Amino acid sequence: MSTTNILLLCGGGGDEHAISLLSANYFETSLATLPQFNVLRVELDVNGHYRTAAGESCELNSRRQIRFDADNRAPWEVDFAIPCIHGFPGETGDIQSYFELINLPYFGCKAEASRNCFNKITAKMWFSALNIPNTPYLFLNEMSDVSIEQATNALVNWGSIFVKAASQGSSVGCYRIDNQEDVASTLAQAFTYSDYVIVEKTISARELEVAVYEIDGEIVATVPGEVICSSNNFYTFDEKYAANSKAQTQVVADISKEVSDLIRQYAISAFKGMKLRHLSRIDFFLTDDGEVLLNEINTFPGLTPISMFPKMLQNHGHSFPDYLLSNINSTD
């Protein structure tokens, strides 16, 4: 039986570096059950340096090889890559652009789709273009008196706002503001994470998530799951990933079939319209008035022990190894 050499690239050096390593563990465990694959795990650090799990310095070159610094180690030919990196440079599309440049097949969304989803401003423009309802917002491109005034006016009109770094993970550089005196300092903090900032109306709503993925040539949208935050406020980075998180998750949300079908319809429309590939987690709000709003799309969702994507996939009747095998074999 012929084997395929798979590069499992993780880390990235960004704010979600540690979470990426946990997700890589999940991939590694699943790939270990598939004997047709040889897997080399390589960590990318904040300085752009590559290192194997054994601590060997190496690099991915344009010939689709992992070349080792040690002179006595032969290059490792790469047939396929899994960019298990949350945030930069994975979900931003940067690493995918390099893979495309060197003609290396890879798992996950392509570069342009990744960029469009990761930038919250671009994503919301796409949602509106696809006629998918989303939260009211405005965006700012500099820290200035004008930006402070615009955000303050939004707070007055909407009662409460979220200020979010536009080009960061969903819970990174994200702050709720209820008081006008907090606007300037919070904007300044958000701008340290991104050149652009988005201001959204705070929505009183339930947080629902759908796993949308491809398997055996079909696009699947699971029934929505639900995240219930202990603070009844916001699904923070710590609540999302910490082992002692008090947030509760339900793989199947307690909602009507009508609402579930509508959410799945929107999710499929977003997946197809934005040309996503292989995997995504698409997050929605269900307001107190029963309105469904698309919140955001994660093109490489977390795969930690408490993450929703693998749980929803399994609940839908698919094993993660079979899902990986299907997509690896079907990717050119």
Curated annotation (Swiss-Prot):
Record-level GO BP terms: cell wall organization; peptidoglycan biosynthetic process; regulation of cell shape
Positions contributing to Mg(2+) 2 binding: E296, N298
Disulphide bridges: none
Cofactor(s) the protein needs: Mg(2+); Mn(2+)
Sample GO molecular function, one term: ATP binding
Superkingdom, taxonomy of origin: Bacteria
Gene3D superfamilies listed in its UniProt record: 3.40.50.20, ATP-grasp fold, A domain (3.30.1490.20), ATP-grasp fold, B domain (3.30.470.20)
Cofactor binding note from Swiss-Prot or TrEMBL: Binds 2 magnesium or manganese ions per subunit.
Gene Ontology CC, one term: cytosol
Enzyme Commission number(s) of this protein: 6.3.2.4
Principal subcellular localisation of the protein: cytoplasm
Family named by the database record: Belongs to the D-alanine--D-alanine ligase family.
Keywords of the record: ATP-binding, Cell shape, Cell wall biogenesis/degradation, Cytoplasm, Ligase, Magnesium, Manganese, Metal-binding, Nucleotide-binding, Peptidoglycan synthesis
Task of the protein: Cell wall formation.
Gene: ddl
Protein name, as recorded: D-alanine--D-alanine ligase
Reaction(s) the record says it catalyses: 2 D-alanine + ATP = D-alanyl-D-alanine + ADP + phosphate + H(+)
Binding site for ATP: 154-209
Residues engaged in binding Mg(2+) 1: D283, E296
Compartment list: Cytoplasm
Ranges for domain ATP-grasp: 124-329
Known pathway: Cell wall biogenesis; peptidoglycan biosynthesis
